[in-house]
Amino acid sequence: MIEVDQSAGAPVRKHKFYQILYVQVLVAIVIGVLLGYFKPDLGEAMKPLGDGFIKLVKMIIAPVIFLTVTTGIAAMSDLKKVGRVAGKAMVYFLVFSTLALIIGMVVSHIVQPGAGLHIDPASLDQKSVAGYVTKAHDSTITGFLLNIIPATMLSPFVGGDILQVLFVAVLFGLSLAMVGPRAQPITDFFNALSAPVFKLVAILMKAAPIGAFGAMAFTIGKYGIKSIVNLAMLVGTFYATSVLFVVVVLGMVARYNGFSIIKLVRYIREELLLVLGTSSSEAALPTLMEKMERAGCSKSVVGLVVPTGYSFNLDGTNIYMTMAALFIAQACDIPLSLGDQILLLLVAMLSSKGAAGVTGAGFITLAATLSVVPTVPVAGMALILGVDRFMSECRALTNLVGNATASIVVARWEGELDKTALHVALNSDGELPSTDPTSPARQGH
């Protein structure tokens, strides 16, 4: 396997296959599954390894987003472009999020994964989902919008809220651009600061196999592979639908915009394996942003589209929400009228916005949706509680591919896509190690 550094004059370095990160993560996942299966108690005890890695990644997310967005916007000569990029991104997010919801609903009608279970809602354990429902009730649309505005300029960096960091970064970047040449020393400082920050990302990623091992060992050790058997139809249908969405829907979008979805998936395979191991798409956020810039998307587009997409472009979560809601209705023998399903769709469109890219967020979002739609019992969520963790991986994987696709598409719409860089990246082995944010590959086009 050859690793290519695209910076000028950089030597070509060869790596043995076992030194490549995605191979290490894949091996770690397999070992974690085996440990959790054969030694469940020991597997459960590995949970701190996964949690620790997630905390390490979250530690660096805020500075990565702030520096990428701020320097990207500050470099823009046309400030109207910021609003234009954001507007195009939101249109893309709305269209494909809605399409994902509809596809989940249509497939559920065709396959009927919950039919024949004949569950009495009164017999379900409502206490098991009470915590999720409480969190869902606390999450209103108004509260979500107000929460984007931080208490202070520094509080987002303490709390790690992605949208708050993005909000501050956009405002600060606009301020730098409006001040003009006088702000150039600050912009230069941020560009220089980006180098050690992205080098730190590369250092932290060395711990990815340990995190993936711990998270997977815990998942299998606690929930067991057998817990998935009883609800295999739902889980299998969800996985198949997600693959269908990526290959067919996103595949058509990719082909129309001049690239291959299969090559894109291959290009971000390290990030996908990281997400698979941790069930959190946030774990791959820093390296995904870096890779999308290497693939020819300008820094300004990546800085706006990727972090925003983590709250507004969750294709996997959207498929899951309508599919899970209809599964519960079918299992409880509750017929849904056309009006009920339209209401479910509309509520899901709203409640899915702002769902965080962390484990369990999709379940909380589902609780928020069902608590507004009276026809489907919230207590029915107890039916899928045991296998939600297994569906969480697929949700996160689909979300990640969706956001990578969105970055390229919006960059192309905006004329900010280096097609040569995209071709080189997607036809390489995906191992592009340079983390220097001042290199040509990382600048706006």
Curated annotation (Swiss-Prot):
GO biological process: L-aspartate transmembrane transport
Alphabetically ordered keywords of this record: Cell inner membrane, Cell membrane, Membrane, Symport, Transmembrane, Transmembrane helix, Transport
Chief location category: membrane
Encoding gene per record: dctA
Organism: Bordetella avium (strain 197N)
Keyword Heme: no
GO CC annotations, alphabetized: plasma membrane
HAMAP family given in the database record: C4_dicarb_transport
Keyword Acyltransferase set for record: no
Transmembrane feature ranges: 17-37, 56-76, 91-111, 157-177, 200-220, 233-253, 319-339, 367-387
Protein name: C4-dicarboxylate transport protein
Annotated GO MF terms: fumarate transmembrane transporter activity; malate:proton symporter activity; succinate transmembrane transporter activity
